[in-house]
Every structure is written in C-alpha cells, then in structure tokens.
Amino acid sequence: MATTKPYRVLLYYMYTTIENPEEFAAEHLAFCNSLELKGRILVAKEGINGTCSGTVEQTEKYMEAMNNDPRFDGIVFKIDEADGHAFKKMHVRPRPELVTLRLEDDINPHEITGKYLEPKDFYEAMKQEDTVIIDARNDYEFDLGHFKGAIKPDIESFRELPDWIRENKEVLEGKKILTYCTGGIRCEKFSGWLVREGYEDVSQLHGGIVTYGKDPEVQGELWDGQCYVFDERIAVPVNQKEHVIVGKDHFTGEPCERYVNCANPECNKKILCSEENEAKYLRACSHECRVSPRNRYVIQHELTEEQVAAALEKIEAGK
C-alpha cells in the first residue's frame, strides 16, 4: 500500500488454537516490546485479538512474524495510517475469551457462524425490505455512528446481547438478519449464536465496519457518523461520500462527535460533549458526579471550592 504517514495502526483477530495463552502472552509481549510496538492484544485458547501501532518498519516486521507462524496462517491485518502511536503502552493479556459472551455452551466460529457478506453484498442486503440490521456493539459505540436503519440493542457490554435478543425476538422473526461490528470478531460468535438459536437467515459483515469503510466500491455508503475504536484515536471516519453527524452532546443535544469519560472515576461513563460543555459541566455526566470528591476534572485543573460552587450555581441558573 502507498504510505504517506510514518506510523500504522494494525487491527486483527484470528480464531485459532493457542495451547498455553499465559506463556504465549508473555513471549508475545517481549517480542512486541523488542519491536517497540504499542497496543492491546488479548490471547485465549481460542485465538488472538489485537490492535497495535508502530512505524511502517516495525509493523511490517510484526506482520511478517505473524504470517510465518503456522497458527496464524491466513490472518488478515486491517491497516490504518497514522501520524503517531495510537496507544501509550504495550499490553498482551491472557483471557478466558477473546470477546466476552460468557455462554454456558460457547460458540466455536469454525463450527457455526453466520454467512459472510463482503461490503458490496452487505450494502445491497441492507437496502432490502425484509432485512433487519443488528449492531453487535455497545450503546456508546452505536451513538457515535452506525448504519442507516440499524437497530441499537440497549446494552452496555457484549455479554448482554443474547439476553436482549431473547427479550426482543419479535423484531427478528421471519426476517433476514444482518449483523456487524468494528472488525468482525464479535459477529463471528454472535451470528453463530443466532444460527444456533434457530434463526435461519443470518449474515455478518466480513471484516467489519473498518473493512467496509475502506472498500473502494461502497466507500462506506449508508454509514452515518464515525466508528468508535478502542485506542487514543477514539473515532475514525467510515463514509467517504458524506459525513452525517449522529452523535448528540450529552448536555445540549447538539451534534457532537467528541467523547470524554465522566470525571468521576467511580462512574467513568463515556459521554459526548463539546470542549465548552466539558468545562461548564466539569466533565461530569450528572450533579452527583460533579460534586464527587474524586472529580478528576476539578483535581486536574486545581479548581477551588469557590470555583466549583460558582460552576454549579451557573448550571443551576441555566436550567
């Protein structure tokens, strides 16, 4: 690929057998550190799921090593150019699952999964009337961007999705089901679970939103907003033809695509808000979080009790 920026961000996953995840994680961390990569990689007996960043040379060496390991034969790397690292540190952690569904009877995507649709086929399928589009991501990811007409499951974590489906099964009955997520890993299991639950026509976006946005034919069309990513970039563009902002400021409801974490560490909720409202509301999602003695915004900006009281008074006066 033609390179114009000095760094790359790699997004990848693979369901494959890793006999000793703890040992692999320790060795892989040492290898990543030797290359001076930064990122977050999860390892389980069922495979690997990672995002990491580095220079073009560093990421080339990493991909070469992964491709030379027979366990990762056929692994696909989604590559974004970047001006610098997308992470502060390098973590490689062993986990019981790559994506946390916590099913009593786990899904093996090698044995059961939904039909793979390439971006063009997914685009065409979304336009059909007898189709329902399920976003397999969390609520805050959906709020920043999603496919037109997609259903937003009211969930805060992936493991809540099966229960949500069971409670809302009438939405799916008799429909062709399309599922999508950021890079595809969640849908490998989720679509397989849907098939096992008895839904007959289940498809998934192959390669996820990231691949859809880079596809030269569809160019991200039918996507509104941006795609939430789990690194310091927070959001990446998808639709190359038009940019429709769907995110709404937590405080005013105005169009917004800027995520911050609530300043109360005991809450830490992700909220969309402008820089102006971050300052006005002390980066807190509620009054309770604003007056928290551990409010990070107050501590970081060394605000006095008088300044906090004045800010609270101003908020109250504006109601």
UniProtKB/Swiss-Prot annotation:
Domain Rhodanese: 127-221
UniProt keyword annotations, A-Z: Oxidoreductase, tRNA processing
Active site location: C181 (cysteine persulfide intermediate)
Catalyzed reactions per annotation: uridine(34) in tRNA + AH2 + O2 = 5-hydroxyuridine(34) in tRNA + A + H2O
One annotated GO biological process: tRNA modification
One Gene Ontology MF term: oxidoreductase activity, acting on paired donors, with incorporation or reduction of molecular oxygen
EC number(s) on file: 1.14.-.-
EC category name: oxidoreductase
Classification via Gene3D superfamilies: 3.30.70.100, Rhodanese-like domain (3.40.250.10)
UniProt superkingdom: Bacteria
Pfam families (alphabetical): Rhodanese (PF00581), Rhodanese_C (PF12368), UPF0176_N (PF17773)
Membrane-spanning residues: none
PANTHER family: RHODANESE-LIKE DOMAIN-CONTAINING PROTEIN 7-RELATED (PTHR43268:SF3), THIOSULFATE SULFURTRANSFERASE/RHODANESE-LIKE DOMAIN-CONTAINING PROTEIN 2 (PTHR43268)
Function: Catalyzes oxygen-dependent 5-hydroxyuridine (ho5U) modification at position 34 in tRNAs.
Family per record: Belongs to the TrhO family.
Protein name: tRNA uridine(34) hydroxylase
Organism for this UniProt entry: Bacillus thuringiensis (strain Al Hakam)
Origin organism lineage: Bacteria, Bacillati, Bacillota, Bacilli, Bacillales
